[in-house]
Each structure stands twice: as structure tokens, then as C-alpha cells.
């Protein structure tokens, strides 16, 4: 919240969703005069985001995690891109800076050891580019489009797999701009919920988890297939997307998806 307030060019309506809220979060938000939504239970990302989005007063909805630090100029990059596009049929995302991996910056793993000074002195030195097929937060969608597709699909509780599912729903609405902005940066501490539940089969990465199974049964293809052949994820951005080329690689991978689909549907009996 602090980073949004001090590092934003524009004024934003901030609407957190509070799960359970026994740690004083509700009281803090009330003191800060920040509007929020609330459930007495852990609603997960999808239900929480859907509830919060209903309170949105502006034309665009930005979904973000609670463990992001927004770097200066993050919203200017979004605004400039929206102005270039000149219509509402898009899905834009920022770029996450991690503490490990390629183009990383070790600025801490939590709020207690966060080195804000190091981040602000070095984030512009990182070599990020605009990329194709983003499925990650922070993402920006026009509110009319968000409402048209029904926001996040809540069957993906607690949330893993819901991002590419949203992308697929947008694809079905003939949206072909899925662009990650290399200069709109947030520092990501990493999911605290995932770390706490790293043995929970419901909370894992996209490949092989419950969310991937739901996606496969819902759409007939895997998340990996969708990101590779449709979204062309992580390639440098060139232009809006078109229908995938149905070459041998595509057809072979599609057959594997259908075999996995049949296994899940009729033998594994996934619920």
C-alpha cells in the first residue's frame, strides 16, 4: 500500500480483500480509510478478487498480490500503453522482479528484511523487455471486459490456474493483445501462502497441479499447450497474436493433451 501511494503517478482506488482478518488487517484498513471486502473464511484469490472488483469505480481493473512493492513509474507505463492501443480489447501486465533467478535483485524475502534503498537504486538497471503472452500479475483489464468474462473462475480455488483460465476466456472473446510491459516493475517477495503450504496438492505451480487438471478438463488443452502455441508466452513482444500455426509439433502436442484429457475424464475421475 505504501509503495502504491508514493510511487504512483496517478491516484488509484485501492480495494484489498481480507481473508479471515484476525491479524488486525481490517482495523488497519479502517484507520487508513481504505475500502475493502471481507470473508470470514479463506476465500482464495478468485472469490476475493471478484468481490473486490465489484467495488471498482474506475474503468480499469488492476489485479495485484499483497506481496508486491510497486516501483516508481509502474502506472505511467500502463497508461502510455493503453493510450497507444486506443481500444479496450487487451490484457496487459507488469513485470515481477524476484530475489532469485535471471534478472533478479536480492532485496529481501519479507517486509522485515526488505532493502527498499537497494531496489530503488538498481531496478532501472535490470534488463527487461516487453514480452508476449503474459499470464501473471500485476495485470490490467478494462472493467467492461472483466465483467463480460465474469472475472476469475472460482472453481480454481485457491487460485492456481485461474490466470491462464482468464486469458483463455479473453481469447474466446477475440482478444489478441497479451502484453507484458518490461518497464512496469514490481518487486515480488514470493507467495507466503504457497511457502506455508508447500506440501498441499492444491497449491503448487501450474504444471501438474489441481488447477492444471481443471483447465485441461474445461478447455481440452493444457496450460502449457495454451501458453506455448496460443499466447507464445515469454517471447519478445512483436504484435498482437493470431491463431496458432497447426504444424506437426502443434498436432503432436495436441494429441498428448487429448490423451491426458481422456485419462482424467474417464480413468482418473478427477473431481
Task: Go through each PLM region and give its residues.
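Short, acidic, metal-binding catalytic loop of nucleotide-sugar glycosyltransferases
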Residues: 2-11
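A conserved acidic beta->alpha catalytic loop
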Residues: 18-27
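Glycine-rich, basic loop-to-helix element that forms the pyrophosphate-binding segment
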Residues: 39-56
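Short aromatic/hydrophobic "clamp" motif used to bind/position activated sugar donors
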Residues: 61
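Conserved donor NDP-sugar-binding/catalytic core segment of glycosyltransferases
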Residues: 72-110
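A short, conserved alpha-helix in the catalytic core of glycosyltransferases
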Residues: 78, 132-150, 155-185
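Active-site donor/metal-binding and catalytic loop motifs
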Residues: 97, 157, 179-202
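Short, flexible, basic/aromatic active-site loop/helix in glycosyltransferases
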Residues: 109-132, 136
Amino acid at each position: 500500500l505504501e509503495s502504491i501511494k508514493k510511487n504512483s503517478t496517478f491516484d488509484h482506488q485501492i480495494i484489498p480483500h481480507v481473508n479471515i482478518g484476525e491479524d488486525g488487517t481490517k482495523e488497519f484498513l479502517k484507520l487508513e480509510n481504505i475500502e475493502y471486502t471481507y470473508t470470514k473464511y479463506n476465500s482464495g484469490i478468485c472469490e476475493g478478487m471478484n468481490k473486490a472488483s465489484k467495488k471498482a469505480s474506475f474503468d480499469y481493473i488492476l489485479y495485484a498480490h499483497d506481496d508486491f512493492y510497486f516501483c516508481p513509474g509502474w502506472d505511467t507505463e500502463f497508461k502510455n500503453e493503453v493510450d497507444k492501443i486506443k481500444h479496450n480489447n487487451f490484457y496487459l501486465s507488469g513485470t515481477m522482479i524476484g530475489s532469485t533467478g535471471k534478472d533478479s535483485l536480492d532485496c529481501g524475502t519479507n517486509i522485515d528484511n526488505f532493502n527498499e534503498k537497494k531496489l530503488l537504486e538498481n531496478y532501472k538497471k535490470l534488463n527487461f523487455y516487453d514480452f508476449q503472452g503474459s499470464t501473471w500479475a500485476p495485470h490490467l483489464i478494462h472493467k467492461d471486459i472483466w465483467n463480460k468474462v465474469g472475472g476469475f473462475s472460482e472453481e480454481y480455488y485457491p487460485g492456481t490456474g485461474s490466470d491462464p483460465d482468464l486469458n483463455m476466456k479473453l481469447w474466446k472473446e477475440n482478444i489478441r493483445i497479451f502484453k507484458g510491459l518490461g518497464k512496469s516493475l514490481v518487486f515480488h517477495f514470493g507467495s507466503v501462502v504457497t511457502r506455508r503450504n508447500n506440501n498441499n496438492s492444491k497449491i503448487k505451480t501450474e504444471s501438474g497441479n489441481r488447477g492444471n487438471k481443471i483447465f485441461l478438463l474445461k478447455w481440452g488443452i493444457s496450460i502449457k499447450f495454451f501458453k506455448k502455441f496460443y499466447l507464445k508466452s515469454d517471447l519478445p513482444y512483436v504484435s498482437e497474436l493470431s491463431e496458432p500455426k497447426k504444424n506437426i509439433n502443434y498436432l503432436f502436442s495436441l494429441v498428448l493433451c487429448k490423451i491426458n484429457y481422456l485419462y482424467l475424464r474417464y480413468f482418473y475421475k478427477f473431481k
